[in-house]
Every structure is written in structure tokens, then in C-alpha cells.
């Protein structure tokens, strides 16, 4: 995960959302590929760290089936990346911070363990979660500017109980 964090820090320095990924061999841990987000600099919505690392690994190995490989990523994969991980037949996934907005391994969906798919993989989240989340928090805080106080939200009136009134029955 340290190597994935290094990749995330490179992304942050480039103004990219700091997510890093590393593909490694399961038998000896040898790193086969590493990548970081490049969506902004490439104007490519698919240029997520996981997808780029999987592409590199498949190219290097000469096969798209990477069942004897693992993937470490600093943020829980989104639907696209989780799908790519399943399609690449990755044998093991390790991720750092959970993603409450897009996480599709454990948080919002469980795509990597979906029983209807033809491949499921071992996965473990929360590895170095504080460090991984910290890189993201620092990046977005700097982007927003720390000195800015949070915007006050207007108070909302409570919702009425029961169904809304029917205008056709107005008396």
C-alpha cells in the first residue's frame, strides 16, 4: 500500500485526484505495474489509477487474465474499476479508504463478490485507511482553501406527515 500511496502523492502534485494503484504478483509480491489517476491531464474519464495499472500489467504480461496477481489501491474502487478488476480476473484486491460516494467493493455495492458473476476475488479494505484518506482530505482541503469557513445551510422545514393534499378535492 505504501507504493500505491506514493503514486497517489504524485497524482496530487499534478493536480489529479490522489488515487494510486499497484499490481503485484501473488506468489512473490513483485510489482508488475503502478499508476495514478490521470483523468484531468488526459481528459479521459476512464483514466483511473486501477484501470491504468491493469492495462500496464496486462501489456507487460502479455495476457489480460491476471488471476495470479493482486491489486492494491488507495481508495475503494468505483463501479467502472470494480468491473475492470473482475474482468481482469484479479486474484486479490486490497484497498485503503472506503468510498462512501462511489465505492462498489463493500460500501455501496459488492461487485467483487457478486455471486452471479463468473469471477469473484478475495478483497480486504481499510488497509492504511487513515493515511489513504488523509492524502485525499489534504488534497481537497487545499483545493477548496482551508481558510474558507463552511457555508451555513438554511434550516429546512420538517416534511408533513401523510400524503400530500389532493388539489382535485379542494373545498
Per-region residue spans from a language model:
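Conserved redox-active cysteine motifs that mediate thiol-disulfide chemistry
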Residues: 75-82, 87
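Immediate flanking context of iron-sulfur cluster ligation sites
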Residues: 63-76
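A short, polar/charged loop-to-alpha-helix boundary motif
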Residues: 41-52
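A structural microfeature
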Residues: 32-33
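Zinc-dependent deaminase
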Residues: 1-11, 84-171
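Short beta-strand scaffold segments in enzyme catalytic cores
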Residues: 19-25
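Glycine-biased flexible loop/turn sites that connect beta-strands or occur in inter-domain linkers
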Residues: 28-29
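Short, basic and Ser/Thr-rich N-terminal targeting/leader segments
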Residues: 15-19, 67
